[in-house]
Amino acid sequence: MKLVLMGLPGAGKGTQAEQIVEKYNIPHISTGDMFRAAMKNNTELGRKAKSFMDNGDLVPDEVTNGIVRERLSEDDAKDGFLLDGFPRTVEQAQELENILSDLGTELDAVINIDVEKDVLMKRLTGRWICRTCGKTYHEIYNPPKVPGKCDLDGGELYQRDDDKKETVEKRLNVNMKQTKPLLDFYSEKGKLHNINGEQEIKDVFVDVEKILASF
């Protein structure tokens, strides 16, 4: 079972990825993990990726694609995998097709966890952290007993800059603009399966299982 998992920040992609790899016994392959492994193993591509990252530059597609090719060629990925964080562009998606074709296989499905922007905003902007002990709260899903104060030590709760509304909205807009052509690409290929990510976590996974039952 060869899968790509997609979803905007706050959609619950990480939670579903954990459940998928556990139930179907396939490796969870994320871009970050691939880069770290390539650098740790000191491969030629790993060294190239490190040089770009050390300079604060984006790793170019040719390096990223090469690292993906190396990872998907490993024995544990022969019978299946869950790709997370790749592809991010149509060009990368086309290269993924080439890589899999060279390996004599193809993607089975692309699962997109779909959540409306206003729901994502509520999920992502509701996080507050205790200045004293670091305990995390969410104003909707896990609120403190007294607004603005930590349940454990009464410490002041604060919001990180990257959890503030303006920052979150900008990040979502960038992600939505980047993701749409990719969703269209996989939809035209007949590979795309959209799942309602606004349900309970367990119900989202039930829908995932229904899709994967046919593979």
Swiss-Prot record:
One of its GO terms (cellular component) is cytoplasm. It is an enzyme of class 2 (transferase). Residues 126-163 are annotated as: LID. Pathway: Purine metabolism; AMP biosynthesis via salvage pathway; AMP from ADP: step 1/1. AMP binds at T31, R36, D57, L58, V59, G85, F86, P87, R88, Q92, R160, R171. Catalyzes the reversible transfer of the terminal phosphate group between ATP and AMP. Plays an important role in cellular energy homeostasis and in adenine nucleotide metabolism. PANTHER family: NUCLEOTIDE KINASE (PTHR23359). Consists of three domains, a large central CORE domain and two small peripheral domains, NMPbind and LID, which undergo movements during catalysis. The LID domain closes over the site of phosphoryl transfer upon ATP binding. Assembling and dissambling the active center during each catalytic cycle provides an effective means to prevent ATP hydrolysis. Some bacteria have evolved a zinc-coordinating structure that stabilizes the LID domain. This is Adenylate kinase. It comes from Listeria monocytogenes serovar 1/2a (strain ATCC BAA-679 / EGD-e).
